Design a protein with these regions (language model features):
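Charged, low-complexity intrinsically disordered terminal segments
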Residues: 15-167, 171-517
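Bacterial N-terminal signal peptides
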Residues: 4-13
Length: 517
């Protein structure tokens, strides 16, 4: 196709759209629902503190989302970077539709990368009178084909490479889930080939209202547009009914095809655990942190006043004894290198758990991280790179955080957490890399609780264990990797990882893509 014709196709692909009303809305008061009032009554005894429970297990993280849908009476607000199709997603969509049937207002805000080529399917759900769906930072033109979408993003790369990386699940403005998980089987231990090890956190009380303010800022931003704006025809009630019938049939087929997986995921329907989790809550002071949605509009580096990192800066600079970090995608850049080595030089014990080359799902990011290893190690920063954790068919392979992954599946790190002086812990969507700092928007919660911090620290130490990780060290100025197999310590002089991964990581270094990672 000639350039002029391709440009014409791009323009025509965005012309056939409808003028969809964009009405501002806000989170509904927690007191409007029985569930919200019940949680408010539980929180009242803690005088402004919020309640937290970690969800490091993929099965629990899925169950918590499903149970929050079932408990919701007035509102559900969902904000996600990625939504992948699969059994877990279909079960959650089925529950969301049932919640909408009983009058719950459902607002779903998706980063536009989620909806590439799926506008009609996603919009069909919005045909329900109680479901609203918006896209953040959408591609306005050329959505009709893969070629025109790709060209459209290239024409406006400065804006289109900036994404909403937030992950938030909020029920009745009174209970929320924050953390690193997107939506898809691989995030809930339900994928057959690869699952992500991650950390979420159930958060109830005042913190949920803070996170509700965060959601409202994004929902009402000029960057968030109703899915209907990108359709040539609005889905009807009959379209929705047909979609629901297909959904039910697909769930029946899933149950017949993989009964064990279906029963494991659907167990929330028969054995709810919300009451148990509420008894296990750790009550503590906290601060919900998020980037301003207008961060993505910056022409170059964003205004520091808009950033989550600016809000987190006081605790980053005041750490004095121990800093532990879990960052699946770690690229410190020069500012991060100066910060981490400066803390280590000041006597702070600094340790980091990230993915190894063989485990990462994005080898290019490893290419951005690898050049910093020697400098970090020379200043005493401890590095641990999670090994690819193969699960054999009997399920005996090691799995970090007791993830409950499908038997036979490998595991890769996707977690994002920081522990400061064994006193405070930060859980959210933020990776220690330029993309989280400069380009994408993020959300998380800083909790002031030695008890919770110790729980997160224990998870970090579990991942840093020799049997689960490679520890890079310097021997005569060269990198070696120390690990353990069958109780025996081994020193590797060549970094583990396939030739394809090595080439991918090497190309990233050669091309100089660090600031985009």
């Amino acid at each position: 196709m000639k350039p002029c014709l391709l440009l014409l196709a791009l323009l025509l692909g965005g012309c056939a759209s409808l003028d969809t009303p964009r009405v501002p809305s806000q989170a509904l008061p927690a007191a409007n629902s029985a569930f919200g009032r019940d949680l408010q009554a539980q929180a009242a005894a803690y005088q402004g503190r919020s309640g937290f429970r970690l969800l490091p297990n993929g099965g629990e993280a899925f169950r918590a989302r499903a149970e929050l849908i079932r408990n919701a009476r007035t509102s559900l607000d969902l904000q996600y970077y990625i939504v992948h199709d699969g059994l877990s997603t279909r079960l959650l969509v089925d529950e969301l539709l049932k919640a909408a049937d009983r009058g719950v207002r459902v607002r779903i805000l998706l980063d536009d990368t989620t909806s590439d080529g799926l506008d009609d399917i996603i919009a069909t759900l919005a045909a329900h009178p109680h479901i609203q769906i918006r896209l953040f930072n959408p591609l306005d033109l050329g959505r009709s084909t893969l070629a025109t979408r790709t060209l459209g993003r290239l024409f406006n790369l400065n804006l289109q490479h900036r994404r909403m990386h937030n992950k938030l699940w909020l029920a009745d403005n009174s209970a929320a889930i924050v953390g690193g998980r997107n939506l898809g089987d691989e995030y809930f231990g339900a994928q057959q080939d690869l699952n992500f090890t991650d950390i979420d956190m159930l958060s109830v009380g005042p913190v949920a209202e803070q996170l509700g303010h965060s959601f409202d800022q994004y929902w009402n931003s000029a960057l968030s547009k109703p899915i209907g704006e990108f359709l040539s025809r609005q889905p009807t009630a009959s379209d929705l009914a047909e979609t629901r019938e297909r959904l039910v049939r697909s769930l029946i087929a899933w149950r017949q095809r993989n009964a064990a997986l279906y029963q494991r995921l659907a167990d929330y329907q028969y054995h709810p655990r919300m009451d148990t989790w509420r008894r296990e809550l750790i009550w503590a002071w906290n601060q919900a942190l998020w980037d301003s949605p207008s961060k993505v509009l910056a022409q170059d580096e964003p205004d520091p006043r808009l950033l989550l990192t600016t809000q987190l800066s006081p605790v980053l600079t005041s750490v004095h004894s121990e800093l532990m970090m879990i960052s699946a995608y770690f690229v410190p850049g020069q500012p991060g290198l100066v910060y981490l080595t400066g803390r280590a030089d000041a006597g702070v014990s600094v340790s980091l758990l990230t993915n190894s080359l063989e485990a990462t799902d994005v080898p290019a990011v490893h290419g951005g991280y690898a050049p910093y290893r020697k400098a970090l190690l020379e200043h005493g920063v401890k590095l641990y790179e999670l090994r690819r954790q193969p699960g054999d068919r009997s399920g005996s392979g090691p799995h970090l955080f007791h993830s409950g992954s499908s038997k036979g599946s490998d595991s890769s790190l996707h977690s994002k957490a920081m522990i400061f002086d064994r006193q405070k812990a930060f859980i959210g969507s933020f990776n220690f890399d330029p993309r989280s700092v400069l380009w994408n928007t993020e959300v998380g919660v800083l909790v002031d609780s030695p008890e919770l911090a110790e729980h997160v620290r224990t998870l970090a130490l579990q991942g840093m264990a020799p049997a689960l990780s490679y520890e890079p060290r310097l021997e005569a100025g060269e990198l070696v990797w120390v690990t353990e197999d069958n109780g025996q310590i081994h020193v590797l002089h060549r970094e583990p990882g396939s030739w394809w991964r090595r080439i991918n990581a090497w190309l990233t270094k050669r091309v100089g893509l660090e600031r985009m990672l």
